[in-house]
């Protein structure tokens, strides 16, 4: 019996909507990354993007455990000398709450062109509204 390999043009991708209200950031991000990769499917193939599209709502209400709300620090560099910037979890949630989930999930996906293609299927919104109603997303309880 030959090993099954999924073809990119035959992969069926579904749309799911997830409510992040009260969910722990890391536990939510691991499940999102697993579904974006397609590892929950029987036809999973490592070198083919077999994952689903995922819409995350209420990103501003995601939870973290312990003192991470004030102690967790996100760093980025502007590219200029001495241009390292930092922001705490609270500041990130206040400024751009979508980025918190995006950063967590992106770190759990493969690095390279395939990982970037998987990441593009993640749509994160701070509120309860999204503009993907035409795709008829199913509610996914994580």
Swiss-Prot record:
Gene3D superfamilies: Ribosomal protein L13. It comes from the Bacteria. InterPro entries: Ribosomal_uL13, Ribosomal_uL13_bac-type, Ribosomal_uL13_CS, Ribosomal_uL13_sf. Pfam families: Ribosomal_L13 (PF00572). One of its GO terms (cellular component) is cytosolic large ribosomal subunit. Keywords: Ribonucleoprotein, Ribosomal protein. GO terms for biological process: negative regulation of translation; translation. One of its GO terms (molecular function) is structural constituent of ribosome. Belongs to the universal ribosomal protein uL13 family. Part of the 50S ribosomal subunit. This protein is one of the early assembly proteins of the 50S ribosomal subunit, although it is not seen to bind rRNA by itself. It is important during the early stages of 50S assembly. HAMAP family: Ribosomal_uL13. NCBIfam families: rplM_bact. This is Large ribosomal subunit protein uL13. It comes from Pectobacterium atrosepticum (strain SCRI 1043 / ATCC BAA-672).
């Amino acid at each position: 019996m030959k090993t099954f390999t999924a073809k990119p043009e035959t992969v069926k991708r579904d749309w799911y909507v997830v409510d992040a209200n009260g969910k722990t950031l890391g536990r939510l991000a691991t499940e999102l990354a697993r579904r974006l990769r397609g590892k929950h499917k029987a036809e999973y193939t490592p070198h083919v993007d077999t994952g689903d599209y995922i819409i995350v709502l209420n990103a501003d209400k995601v939870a973290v455990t312990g003192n991470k709300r004030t102690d967790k620090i996100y760093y980025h560099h502007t590219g200029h000398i001495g241009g390292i910037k930092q922001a705490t979890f609270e500041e990130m949630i206040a400024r751009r709450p979508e980025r918190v989930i995006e950063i967590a999930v992106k770190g759990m996906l493969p690095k390279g062109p395939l990982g970037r293609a998987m990441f593009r299927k993640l749509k994160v919104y701070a509120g309860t509204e999204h503009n993907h109603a035409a795709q008829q997303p199913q509610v996914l309880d994580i």
